[in-house]
Amino acid sequence: MKQAIRVAAFVAATLCTSVVISQVEKKIQQTERFPQFDNEDVKVWKTIVMPHQPLAMHHHDHPRVIIALTGGTMNIVDPAGAVEPHIWETGKAYWLPAMPPNAMHSDVNAGDKPMEVMVVELQKEK
């Protein structure tokens, strides 16, 4: 429980500084990941996902919480091309479970503006 409180405090502090960081990151022209925090319990990163620039196919071994710093529609695309749209509202958090073994996906920002998300990935099973 104490670790969860620490993570929540860290995420809240990060969200408060997001506006300042965003001013620096406005010059970004392609999708980028910015590591924020990493230990044996959680891994936290911020990603700015540019419009219509698919991320490389990848896999998530662990469950994660996505916090939409800016809202929009993120299309989750599997290797066969099937699209699962996720509509994320600014300031809201969303739970995404670990992916099944060997499953892959790509993320595509379906909007016309960059989307910023904070990802908190849990590293341990309960």
Model-identified regions with their sequence ranges:
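A short glycine-rich, His/Asp/Glu-containing loop-to-beta-strand
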Residues: 29-56, 61-66, 119-120
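Glycine- and acidic-residue-biased ligand/ion/polar-headgroup-sensing regions
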Residues: 60-80
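Ligand-binding loop in jelly-roll beta-barrel domains
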Residues: 100-125
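Histidine-centered metal-chelating micro-motifs
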Residues: 52-56, 92-95, 99-106
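Bacterial N-terminal signal peptides that target proteins for export
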Residues: 1-9
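Short acidic-glycine-tyrosine-enriched beta hairpin
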Residues: 38-41, 81-99
